[in-house]
Amino acid sequence: MSNNQTLFERAQRTIPGGVNSPVRAFRSVGGTPRFVARAQGAYFWDADGKRYIDYIGSWGPMIVGHVHPDVLAAVQRVLADGFSFGAPTEAEIEIAEEICKLVPSIEQVRMVSSGTEATMSALRLARGFTGRSRIVKFEGCYHGHADSLLVKAGSGLLTFGNPTSAGVPADVAKHTTVLEYNNVAALEEAFAAFGGEIAAVIVEPVAGNMNLVRGTPEFLNALRALTAKHGAVLIFDEVMCGFRVALGGAQQHYGITPDLTCLGKVIGGGMPAAAFGGRGDIMSHLAPLGDVYQAGTLSGNPVAVAAGLATLRLIQAPGFHDALADKTRRLADGLAAEARAAGVPFSADAIGGMFGLYFTEQVPASFADVTKSDIERFNRFFHLMLDAGVYFAPSAYEAGFVSSAHDDATLDATLDAARRAFAALRA
C-alpha cells in the first residue's frame, strides 16, 4: 500500500470523506488523492516522494509559484512580531491601498479570510444598501458555500454529483434566482419581470468552477446596463480570476466597472485571505459606519497580509501578465494540437493565467455546454497524466492555473506526456 493510500485511510477515520474540501477526494475521477509533502516553484512532491507538475496551484493563489523567495521572506519577517492581534495594523492599510490602486472600481475594501466570506458579506451589503432581498446568480458559477448561493451551485458540488445541498432552507433559497450564463435574453426577461426586487446580481466574469467559461462582452455589458437601470448592485466575483486574467482583473480585461468586487486567492499569496470592496457610498453602509454588520477575528491577519502584499508587488513587474498569458495559451493550444493529431475530440481555452480542458469539439459558453463533455474520457486522461507526473484538476468541472514558475521545460514535459496520453485514449 502506498503512503498516499495509508494517509487517505487514516484521514477518513477523523475527517469526513478524508478531506477538508470535497474536490480533493478524487470522487469524480476515482483513485487515491495525492497527499502533498512539499512544493517548490511549479512542482509538488507527494507522500510517496513522486514529483508532479502542478496545474492547480492551491486552486489559483500560487500565481508566482510555490514558496517564492520574496513571499517566504515577507512571511518570515512578520512571524517574529506575532501571528494575530485582533487589532488594526499598518500592513492592513498597505494592502488596502494596493488593492484600491490595482482595481480602480474599488474605492474602499474590507479584508476577510475566505472567498465565501467575501461573497456572503457583499450580498448582505447589497441587500442592506438597496433594501431588497432577491439575488440573481448564474448556473455553473460558484460563489462559495453560503446558503443563499447553494442553489444549483457548481464546483465542489458537481464533483460528487449533487446539484443542491441538504441543510439549505427553502425559505432562504427562494430569494435566489438562477439564470443561464451568457444568456442575454434570459437576463432581460428576468429584469423585466422583477427588476425592482433585485438587490444584486453576482457573477464570475470569467467562470472557473464549471471549468473555464468566459463571460461574453455582450452578456457582461448587458449586466452592467440592466443593473444600473434598475438600481441593483452588480457584484463581480473575482475570487478566482482577479489578478489572473489581468493585473486589474477581468473588469480591466473587459472594460466594465462593477459596483462591488470580491477578491481572494492571489491576495493571500497562499494564506487564508480574501476581500470585498467597491463604491464608497455602498461600502459606507458597513459597520462600524453603517448598519450592515460584518466582522472577523482573523480578518487582516498579519501573516496572510504579508504574503498577499509580497505577491501583489511581484505581479506588478513589467510584462508579468503578458508572459503568464503566453505560457497559458501555449499550454492550451499545445494540448489541443496533440489531441487533434491523435484524433481525440477535445478543445481548450486560456485567458490570462487560467485555462480549460474540454472533451468536446467546441469550447463551452454555458454550464449546459460543459455537461456535454466526455467525462469518462476526461477521467482516463487525468489518470494518464497523473501517472506521468502532471497534476491537473481532479474534476472535469474545474479550471486549471499556470504560474510564473512554469517554464519551457515544464510546458514541454506536459505536452510530451499529453501526446502519449492522447495516443492511449485513441487506442
UniProtKB/Swiss-Prot annotation:
Its main location: cytoplasm. Its EC number is 5.4.3.8. CDD domains: OAT_like. One of its GO terms (molecular function) is glutamate-1-semialdehyde 2,1-aminomutase activity. It is an enzyme of class 5 (isomerase). Its cofactor is pyridoxal 5'-phosphate. It holds the Pfam family Aminotran_3. It catalyses: (S)-4-amino-5-oxopentanoate = 5-aminolevulinate. It comes from the Bacteria. It is found in: Cytoplasm. This is Glutamate-1-semialdehyde 2,1-aminomutase. The gene is hemL.
